[in-house]
Amino acid sequence: MSVESSSSAVQQPPSSSNLPLLGDNQAVATTSSASSASSSSTSSSSSSVGGGNVVGVPLDTQGSGEPPAKKQLLDGGGGGATSSSGSSLLSSAAAASGMHEKLAHRISNALCCAVCLDLPKTAMYQCQMGHLMCAACFTHLLADGRLRDQIATCPNCRVEISKSTASRNLAVEKAASELPSECQFCNKEFPYKSLERHEQHECQERPTKCKYHRIGCQWRGPYHETNEHERNCLHPQKSGYEVMAALEAHDDRIKEEKKMFNTLIDLLSYEKIIFNDLQMKPYRTDEYVHKLFYETARFSAFNQQWVVKARINNSQRDPHQSNERTITYQLILKTKTSTPMSIHFFALKGPFSDMKVSTQIYKHEFTETSTESEYYVLPLPDGVGGSGSSECNRMLANKGINFRLLMFLLNK
């Protein structure tokens, strides 16, 4: 963050023609005549103006011809004067920093989405009247209109919106990408467009594993401590027998991933596959203790109406008192079905989302009596401390959670 500051220039003594008018009892210092100045470098002249005695200021004729106090200030000395100047600079820098933050905040408010009040992370659309909507909210409004069998409208001015009438606002997208955003690891600010690269490859505080983690080292810490740890790591000195357990656990994880991907390949061969780009918004229960939960609007899939619901720490009474945080979600059938429906589903990052989530496929058979799946863990990547709490906190800090839901219907 650059701070522009201007140092106050030392003013030159006014010429005799620009001297201010004096009262009867005021005195002004004047220089001696040219002849007396040349004869003595340290002489001072005295004159009387309005009856007052005036003492001349000695000049440094061997140097720059400036008064000593002024010469000392120009040379960088001055003791108290320098301290005062430094304090003034710090005050100016602090004031400029505060103005910069306020300006960034005002610009953020002007460029935010009219629906979720968040800055755009992908494309930004506008209605015919110029009201802004991020891509996620824009598609959400269009989907709501389709479900209600109504024409979608702008939430601000109620003008009709559609893919043909709304247009992208590239200027807003460009401006939003330049706004400062805070790194979740080092808390420094970077332009939003370069934040992801910084967090993944440049940040010295980003969580990193030891390069010997495959043979059992469980260390995980900031990147700048990696070299020191690896120099002192004891795992390279262990025997093959000692690291066999870690290698077997690593092989088991590889087998599980291979099994999951094989399952996904089989699911992609199904006849009925559908995906929806959804947005979960926060709500509170009506209980005495209002618990937080997230829920999407209704969406259509396989000629049925569905909802996705999520909760934090399995609806723990006081989740704010826990350092470990998880998100679990369930798929709910909102319409009646006469035949059982065997559904495979999983959540993943969508085109309007910056959510970091691993792939985990779940299955539930929906019937007339079983319209809600169990709550399944939303697998978030490990952060600081080896858990997904940091990613969970980042998602909870947003106005909503955008994601894509893939669903596969098994024909029987």
UniProtKB/Swiss-Prot annotation:
<dbReference type="GO" id="GO:0008270">
    <property type="term" value="F:zinc ion binding"/>
</dbReference>
<feature type="zinc finger region" description="TRAF-type">
    <location>
        <begin position="171"/>
        <end position="227"/>
    </location>
</feature>
<keyword id="KW-0862">Zinc</keyword>
<keyword id="KW-0863">Zinc-finger</keyword>
<dbReference type="InterPro" id="IPR001841">
    <property type="entry name" value="Znf_RING"/>
</dbReference>
<feature type="region of interest" description="Disordered">
    <location>
        <begin position="1"/>
        <end position="85"/>
    </location>
</feature>
<feature type="compositionally biased region" description="Low complexity">
    <location>
        <begin position="29"/>
        <end position="48"/>
    </location>
</feature>
<comment type="similarity">
    <text>Belongs to the ZFTRAF1 family.</text>
</comment>
<protein>
    <recommendedName>
        <fullName>Zinc finger TRAF-type-containing protein 1 homolog</fullName>
    </recommendedName>
</protein>
<dbReference type="InterPro" id="IPR039338">
    <property type="entry name" value="ZFTRAF1"/>
</dbReference>
<dbReference type="InterPro" id="IPR001293">
    <property type="entry name" value="Znf_TRAF"/>
</dbReference>
<dbReference type="InterPro" id="IPR013083">
    <property type="entry name" value="Znf_RING/FYVE/PHD"/>
</dbReference>
<dbReference type="GO" id="GO:0005634">
    <property type="term" value="C:nucleus"/>
</dbReference>
<feature type="zinc finger region" description="RING-type; degenerate">
    <location>
        <begin position="113"/>
        <end position="158"/>
    </location>
</feature>
<keyword id="KW-0479">Metal-binding</keyword>
<feature type="compositionally biased region" description="Low complexity">
    <location>
        <begin position="1"/>
        <end position="17"/>
    </location>
</feature>
